[in-house]
Amino acid sequence: MPVTAYVLIQTEVGKAQVAKQVGPINGVTSAENLTGPSDVIVPAEARSIDDLGRMVVSQIQLTEGITATVTCPVVNL
């Protein structure tokens, strides 16, 4: 069953281009700059929670300028 999540990203000061850098990653559906405690929000989809974790760790977190991420999987209650 596919997994959807929102990845909240904190960046270094002056790194507004992070949203443009993560946008093309396979599984990322969009990337938007924010104000507040997070700098970028990234809705993402993957085939499984494990695939989602691999995408976040091996692709999103390795993007230059990212200092922290929080991944919030969507749940159906």
Task: Show which residues each predicted segment covers.
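A compositional/biophysical signature of low hydrophobicity enriched in polar/charged and small residues
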Residues: M1-L77
